[in-house]
């Protein structure tokens, strides 16, 4: 106890600022206590430090493994995405080619349909023209015939008198009578 109180008393009597010196008193500098503390720390701390380093090493290795797995997964997904992209590009090219083919086919169908429609319209036009020509010809014939008949009737009426008219009627009646006899036989 005396040593403890002496150490506190000696703390109160520090020499005032004087020079720098090396203390050779082994008990005052406490190297034994320091070496014991350092020895205990090294002995017990070695295992703790080793465990800490091993845990840290395992975490780093796990992180590296996880990173590698994630990298491999990302590479695999990238390859799948590239394959899908190639497939979609091929399908797009196919649709484009088919679309152009379909457009060309539709274009040809439309041209053919339009040509057929124009041909039908031309036929209808020609039939209508022919019909109108025939109708005009028939109308002209009827007029000519009507005018000829009117002219003939006018001529006959001007030439016929009552006596000639009676003789014509008698001749026609005689002709009908002989036709009737021929039929009955």
From Swiss-Prot:
<comment type="subunit">
    <text>F-type ATPases have 2 components, F(1) - the catalytic core - and F(0) - the membrane proton channel. F(1) has five subunits: alpha(3), beta(3), gamma(1), delta(1), epsilon(1). F(0) has four main subunits: a(1), b(1), b'(1) and c(10-14). The alpha and beta chains form an alternating ring which encloses part of the gamma chain. F(1) is attached to F(0) by a central stalk formed by the gamma and epsilon chains, while a peripheral stalk is formed by the delta, b and b' chains.</text>
</comment>
<dbReference type="Pfam" id="PF00430">
    <property type="entry name" value="ATP-synt_B"/>
</dbReference>
<keyword id="KW-1133">Transmembrane helix</keyword>
<protein>
    <recommendedName>
        <fullName>ATP synthase subunit b, chloroplastic</fullName>
    </recommendedName>
</protein>
<keyword id="KW-0375">Hydrogen ion transport</keyword>
<keyword id="KW-0472">Membrane</keyword>
<feature type="transmembrane region" description="Helical">
    <location>
        <begin position="27"/>
        <end position="49"/>
    </location>
</feature>
<dbReference type="GO" id="GO:0009535">
    <property type="term" value="C:chloroplast thylakoid membrane"/>
</dbReference>
<keyword id="KW-0934">Plastid</keyword>
<comment type="similarity">
    <text>Belongs to the ATPase B chain family.</text>
</comment>
<keyword id="KW-0150">Chloroplast</keyword>
<dbReference type="GO" id="GO:0046933">
    <property type="term" value="F:proton-transporting ATP synthase activity, rotational mechanism"/>
</dbReference>
<keyword id="KW-0813">Transport</keyword>
<dbReference type="GO" id="GO:0045259">
    <property type="term" value="C:proton-transporting ATP synthase complex"/>
</dbReference>
<keyword id="KW-0138">CF(0)</keyword>
<comment type="function">
    <text>F(1)F(0) ATP synthase produces ATP from ADP in the presence of a proton or sodium gradient. F-type ATPases consist of two structural domains, F(1) containing the extramembraneous catalytic core and F(0) containing the membrane proton channel, linked together by a central stalk and a peripheral stalk. During catalysis, ATP synthesis in the catalytic domain of F(1) is coupled via a rotary mechanism of the central stalk subunits to proton translocation.</text>
</comment>
<comment type="function">
    <text>Component of the F(0) channel, it forms part of the peripheral stalk, linking F(1) to F(0).</text>
</comment>
<keyword id="KW-0066">ATP synthesis</keyword>
<keyword id="KW-0406">Ion transport</keyword>
<keyword id="KW-0812">Transmembrane</keyword>
<dbReference type="InterPro" id="IPR002146">
    <property type="entry name" value="ATP_synth_b/b'su_bac/chlpt"/>
</dbReference>
<keyword id="KW-0793">Thylakoid</keyword>
């Amino acid at each position: 106890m005396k040593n403890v109180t002496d150490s506190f008393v000696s703390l109160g009597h520090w020499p005032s600022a004087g020079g720098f010196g090396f203390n050779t008193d082994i008990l005052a500098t406490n190297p034994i206590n320091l070496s014991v503390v350092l020895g205990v720390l090294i002995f017990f701390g070695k295992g703790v430090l080793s465990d800490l380093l091993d845990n840290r090493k395992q975490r780093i290795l796990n992180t590296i493994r996880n990173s590698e797995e994630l990298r491999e997964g990302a590479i695999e997904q990238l390859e799948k995405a590239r394959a899908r992209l190639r497939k979609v590009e091929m399908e797009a090219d196919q649709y484009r080619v088919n679309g152009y083919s379909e457009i060309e086919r539709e274009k040809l169908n439309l041209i053919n349909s339009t040509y057929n429609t124009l041909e039908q319209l031309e036929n209808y036009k020609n039939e209508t023209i022919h019909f109108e020509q025939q109708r005009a010809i028939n109308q002209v014939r009827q007029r000519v015939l009507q005018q000829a008949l009117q002219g003939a009737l006018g001529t006959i009426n001007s030439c016929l008198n009552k006596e000639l008219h009676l003789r014509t009627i008698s001749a026609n009646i005689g002709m009908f009578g002989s036709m009737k006899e021929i039929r009955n036989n």
